[in-house]
Curated annotation (Swiss-Prot):
Interacts with the flavoprotein subunit within the SDH catalytic dimer. This protein may be expected to contain an N-terminal transit peptide but none has been predicted. This is Succinate dehydrogenase assembly factor 2, mitochondrial. GO terms for biological process: copper ion homeostasis; mitochondrial electron transport, succinate to ubiquinone; mitochondrial respiratory chain complex II assembly; protein-FAD linkage; tricarboxylic acid cycle. It is found in: Mitochondrion matrix. HAMAP family: SDHAF2. Keywords: Chaperone, Mitochondrion. The keyword Mitochondrion applies. InterPro entries: SDH (IPR005631), SDH_sf (IPR036714), SDHAF2 (IPR028882). Disulfide bonds: none annotated. It comes from Drosophila grimshawi. GO terms for cellular component: mitochondrial matrix; mitochondrion. It holds the Pfam family Sdh5.
């Protein structure tokens, strides 16, 4: 009995669904050059303290645990000492890149960093990722306020 139902289910799954009116069949190529990417809004009048608070939050909420841990510990350790230019470079790094996996692969050395992101801040992040102090990074650090 089961054997006789198997071809029927296979035909149903393999049948042409071109008559479907839903968008379930649309495949998006995320590496395609025609994919429109939203531009990150520039905030020219944002005070430095507020910018650091925003970056601290954004470093913690990346959408992938690997970057949550790496960037939150990095921001906790270094962001408070960044000047305005370094803060702007870090902002561009974590918000100018459209794919968080790229940041992870660059920081861990899996992929080469593009020239526009090869900065002192990226080098500092790469050193942080190497974790030469052998610091346990199983959870995000407590929130710190910079205002």
């Amino acid at each position: 009995m089961v054997r006789s139902l198997l071809p029927l289910s296979w035909r149903r799954c393999a049948s042409d669904s071109s008559n479907s009116s839903t968008n379930d069949d649309i495949i998006v190529d995320y590496d395609g050059p025609d994919l429109p990417l939203p531009e990150y809004p520039n905030r020219p009048n944002e005070p430095l303290g507020m910018r650091k608070q925003r970056l601290l939050y954004q470093s913690r909420k990346r959408g992938m645990l690997e970057n949550d841990l790496l960037l939150s510990t990095f921001a906790h350790k270094y962001l408070k000492d960044f000047d305005e230019d370094e803060t702007a470079i870090y902002d561009e790094l974590i918000n100018g890149v459209s794919n968080d996996w790229d940041i992870y692969y660059w920081a861990t050395g899996v992929k080469p960093t593009p020239p526009q992101y090869e900065t002192d801040i990226m080098e500092l992040l790469k050193q942080h990722v190497k974790n030469t102090e052998k610091v346990a990074r199983f959870r995000q650090p407590e929130l710190t306020y910079y205002l």
